C-alpha cells in the first residue's frame, strides 16, 4: 500500500526527533558517568599543576635575582674597603720613605725639623756636644779590638838617657787616639754589639723610658766590663778636662738609637752626657754591670 508524501515526511520527522533525544540522553549519561568525571578531574589537576610549576619557577627566579643584588652590594662595600686600605698603605709607605707628609702623620716622637736618620754622623755628634758641626770625613776610621784598646792604656816612656827622668808630657800611648779638629783626643772606634728587637724592648723597659738611662744601658751593652775598667777615670764623654773622649762610632750609635725613640732637646742631651761621665768616673763591679743589663 503506497504511503502519501505527507505521511512519509511525518515519519521522518519523528525519527529525527527520536534520534536527537537519544543523542541528548546519551551525552547527559556520559557526563554523569564516573569515567567522564575522572577524566575531567585529571584535566583540572594537570592545569593546576602547570600553574603551580610556573609559580614555583617564578619564585626561584626572584630569589636568585635578590641574591645577585645582595652580592653586588657586598662587592661595592669591598671596593670601598680596598680603596681605604690603599690610602692607608700609601700613607704608611710615605712615612717609611721619610717624606714630610708621612712624618707629620705618623711620627710622634721626633720633631719635624730634626730627623736623626737624615743627619750626618758629624752633625749628630756636634749636636749632642753643642759644638759647631765639623767635617770629620778626612779622619781615618780605626776599628780596633779589645786587646788594642788595652794596649792603648799601657803607658811606656820614651827611650831617654839613664840619667834623665821621663816627664809626664813625654809619656806616650802605644796606640795613638784620634785627634779631632776641636783639639780633643778620642779613642779609636770599637766593634759594637748587635742590638735585636727583644733586647731593645728589654732595655726600654729597664730604662723606665728615660733617655739618659736608655743611653747608659746602650753604653753597657756595647762596652765589655773589662774594657770599661780600663776606661774608668781616664775617659769621659767628649774628651774634655784632659781625658780621652769616647770612640766616635760608640757616641754616634748611642745618640742615634736614643734619638730614634725619644725627643732629645738640650736638657736631655746634657743629662746623657752627665750620666755617662758619672759612670766613667769610678770602676764598677762585674755583678753591678751585669745587673744593669
From Swiss-Prot:
GO terms for biological process: pole plasm assembly. GO terms for cellular component: cytoplasm; mitochondrial cloud; nucleus; P granule; pole plasm. Keywords: Cytoplasm, Developmental protein, Differentiation, Nucleus, Oogenesis. Interacts with poc1b. It is found in: Cytoplasm; Nucleus. Disulfide bonds: none annotated. One of its GO terms (molecular function) is DNA binding. InterPro entries: BEN_domain. Coiled coil: none annotated. Transmembrane segments: none annotated. It comes from Xenopus laevis (African clawed frog). Residues 187-287 form the BEN domain. It comes from the Eukaryota. An mRNA and protein component of germ plasm and primordial germ cells (PGCs) throughout oogenesis and early development, being first localized to the granulo-fibrillar material (GFM) of the mitochondrial cloud in stage I and II oocytes and to the periphery of mature germinal granules both in oocytes and in embryos. Shows some somatic expression including the ectodermal cells of tailbud embryos. In adults, only expressed in ovaries. Probably plays a role in germ plasm formation, positioning and maintenance. This is Protein Pat.
Amino acid at each position: 500500500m503506497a504511503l502519501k508524501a505527507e505521511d512519509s515526511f511525518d515519519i521522518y520527522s519523528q525519527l529525527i526527533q527520536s534520534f536527537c533525544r537519544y543523542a541528548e540522553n546519551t551525552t547527559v549519561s556520559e557526563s554523569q558517568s564516573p569515567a567522564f568525571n575522572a577524566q575531567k578531574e585529571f584535566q583540572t589537576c594537570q592545569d593546576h599543576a602547570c600553574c603551580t610549576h610556573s609559580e614555583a619557577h617564578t619564585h626561584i627566579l626572584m630569589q636568585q635575582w635578590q641574591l645577585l643584588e645582595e652580592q653586588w652590594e657586598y662587592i661595592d662595600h669591598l671596593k670601598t674597603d680596598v680603596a681605604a686600605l690603599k690610602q692607608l698603605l700609601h700613607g704608611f709607605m710615605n712615612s717609611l720613605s721619610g717624606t714630610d707628609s708621612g712624618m707629620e702623620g705618623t711620627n710622634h716622637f721626633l720633631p719635624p725639623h730634626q730627623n736623626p736618620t737624615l743627619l750626618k754622623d758629624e752633625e749628630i755628634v756636634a749636636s749632642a756636644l753643642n759644638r759647631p758641626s765639623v767635617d770629620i770625613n778626612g779622619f781615618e776610621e780605626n776599628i780596633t779590638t779589645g786587646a788594642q784598646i788595652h794596649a792603648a792604656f799601657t803607658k811606656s816612656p820614651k827611650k831617654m838617657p839613664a840619667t834623665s827622668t821621663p816627664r809626664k808630657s813625654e809619656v806616650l800611648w802605644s796606640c795613638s787616639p784620634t785627634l779631632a779638629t776641636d783639639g780633643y783626643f778620642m779613642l779609636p772606634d770599637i766593634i759594637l754589639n748587635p742590638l735585636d728587637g727583644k733586647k731593645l724592648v728589654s732595655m726600654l723597659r729597664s730604662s723606665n723610658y728615660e733617655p739618659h738611662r736608655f743611653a747608659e744601658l746602650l753604653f753597657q751593652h756595647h762596652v765589655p766590663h773589662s774594657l770599661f775598667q780600663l776606661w774608668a777615670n781616664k775617659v769621659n764623654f767628649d774628651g774634655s778636662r784632659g781625658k780621652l773622649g769616647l770612640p766616635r762610632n760608640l757616641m754616634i750609635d748611642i745618640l742615634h738609637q736614643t734619638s730614634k725613640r725619644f725627643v732629645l732637646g738640650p736638657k736631655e742631651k746634657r743629662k746623657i752626657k752627665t750620666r755617662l761621665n758619672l759612670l766613667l768616673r769610678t770602676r764598677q763591679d762585674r755583678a753591678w754591670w751585669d745587673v744593669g743589663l
